[in-house]
Amino acid sequence: MPSYTVTVATGSQWFAGTDDYIYLSLIGSAGCSEKHLLDKAFYNDFERGAVDSYDVTVDEELGEIQLVRIEKRKYWLHDDWYLKYITLKTPTDYIEFPCYRWITGEGEIVLRDGRAKLARDDQIHILKQHRRKELEARQKQYRWMEWNPGFPLSIDAKCHKDLPRDIQFDSEKGVDFVLNYSKAMENLFINRFMHMFQSSWNDFADFEKIFVKISNTISERVKNHWQEDLMFGYQFLNGCNPVLIKRCRELPQKLPVTTEMVECSLERHLSLEQEVQEGNIFIVDYELLDGIDANKTDPCTHQFLAAPICLLYKNLANKIVPIAIQLNQAPGEKNPIFLPSDAKYDWLLAKIWVRSSDFHVHQTITHLLCTHLVSEVFGIAMYRQLPAVHPIFKLLVAHVRFTIAINTKAREQLICEYGLFDKANATGGGGHVQMVQRAVQDLTYSSLCFPEAIKARGMDSTEDIPYYFYRDDGLLVWEAIQSFTSEVVSIYYEDDQVVMEDQELQDFVKDVYVYGMRGRKASGFPKSIKSREKLSEYLTVVIFTASAQHAAVNFGQYDWCSWIPNAPPTMRAPPATAKGVVTIEQIVATLPDRGRSCWHLGAVWALSQFQENELFLGMYPEEHFIEKPVKEAMTRFRKNLEAIVNVIAERNKNKKLPYYYLSPDRIPNSVAI
């Protein structure tokens, strides 16, 4: 009678263990065993973090083991169990069966060995059937839903507990936005102000009552220098929204600025048109905000939005500084162009309006749409179309970890009607929805390809723009990811023909196009992939968006937005329509009140924190891959990332404003906050 040694590993997260009965069946090429109860006398099996071994003897020859079936039956109360993996020592072999899934209720799970396989590799009927049944079950669990008209489709779940257990957070309490924001305000000692809506601050210094002063930090430097043009310009390159600035190839007609108006800012003694031709003029246009409805959820507080155009100049020191700001799109007598030569407070308020507009576009488009929602689309499509044995599933699963869950919590508490977003933001109350609906029309595949996106904005020259660290570090990380994905692709796809014939892969790509991009041809998202090179690029887009891009635009929020005048989430008076009338009192009365300031501060603090036990780029503790060539590729990937960490650390030495958001040791694997 054949005898097997079965090793069972239970997860180490909270509540991973179980007291339920666990049964195991072995399915081989020659037959299926009876189910065996895995139990040791006087021993507490399947405790959290435990690795337990059992001897299993079967009555007949099973042939080569193909599958392992695990069944969980209730002992007292239903007790979910997180199974990491099973190993099987047979008379002639040693087989690993990765799982990394929850078994809930009176459930069962059927596992394949850990070798990654394309559909063409499965010749045995039982394996083909297992593959098909897994996808059929997943497609019933992971359903598309339209949360708002025009949005990329999201998961069909009203709240976190409705999600499949495998993609829920280990502890929902840890990602409760209401709890976390309130806790953040308590930790920042600002909760005494959190209900003081309609109560204005007295002056700029008064904002220090809610500012946590930590020496030698970016946030402190922002507080001390936020009014300076150099600091204003620097943020377009290396702040938390470094994706909008582009080289100005032609002055737009809607911004009728002349050489005479900006002459005192031009250091090369050239006309404005000549500076444009020389490539020294840059522009940031917030046209997306034009006509967006401002927040009206609080009848006691009027809130306002602008749609500014900001012209910037590269001076002789190669630094970017603002030279002209128009606060709305249509030129006219009541929409003056503000200049550095204007009265101090005229110019300052114009810059504050730009910073406020930048905050809105950052939160809703750069952050929410282009990382969170896009990554969720990739995640849902992956679960629907790629079985766990598929190499692309094994590659991507770490990079969609908790993404669907965090987005579901956001729809439940944060960006829903009367959610937390409405409390402090001028684009709350529906404006943020309008913004996404507009921006989706311009979302393209090439905008997610980092090198292409940088080049399209004319920002690719390191000689012309030497202080664009977001670009420099992003390209290093992109190249490291692309090198890694190319290696993995070459292991499983020997030529382009294999890529084209992988129907599961093609269905995954098609799902993203049809449901994520809503079948919009102008998006440029591929409907299919026809080469190994294009597959590697596509996988790099998925991983880079979920990891590096999200890190770049998320984890600097407290640094750059905690000083309220530098990133006001709302404005309580409309943009100035004339020059020479702005006073310091008017600026303070325009900035957010005490209550909204506190909710904003709690939000940017909470969103900027890493998760407990965060997994950073290159960390793959769940061993979905067992093959040596892939593990060697992972090792090379980690070494490349470590080299990038060292390059960035060396550059940042002695810098007053270090840029570290794209250092791989600070880039989480996935969008999970």
Curated annotation (Swiss-Prot):
EC number: 1.13.11.-, 1.13.11.34
Catalytic function, reaction form: (5Z,8Z,11Z,14Z)-eicosatetraenoate + O2 = leukotriene A4 + H2O; 18-HEPE + O2 = (5S)-hydroperoxy-18-hydroxy-(7E,9E,11Z,14Z,16E)-eicosapentaenoate; (18R)-hydroxy-(5Z,8Z,11Z,14Z,16E)-eicosapentaenoate + O2 = (5S)-hydroperoxy-(18R)-hydroxy-(6E,8Z,11Z,14Z,16E)-eicosapentaenoate; (18S)-hydroxy-(5Z,8Z,11Z,14Z,16E)-eicosapentaenoate + O2 = (5S)-hydroperoxy-(18S)-hydroxy-(6E,8Z,11Z,14Z,16E)-eicosapentaenoate
Cross-referenced Gene3D superfamilies: 3.10.450.60, Lipoxygenase-1, Domain 5, PLAT/LH2 domain
Amino-acid positions noted as binding Ca(2+) 1 in the UniProt annotation, renumbered to this chain: 17, 79-80
Annotated ranges, domain PLAT: 2-117
GO CC annotation: cytosol; nuclear envelope lumen; nuclear matrix; nuclear membrane; perinuclear region of cytoplasm
SMART domains on file: LH2 (SM00308)
Cofactor notes: Binds 1 Fe cation per subunit.
Family membership: Belongs to the lipoxygenase family.
This protein's name: Polyunsaturated fatty acid 5-lipoxygenase
Species per Swiss-Prot/TrEMBL record: Mesocricetus auratus
Gene from which this protein is expressed: ALOX5
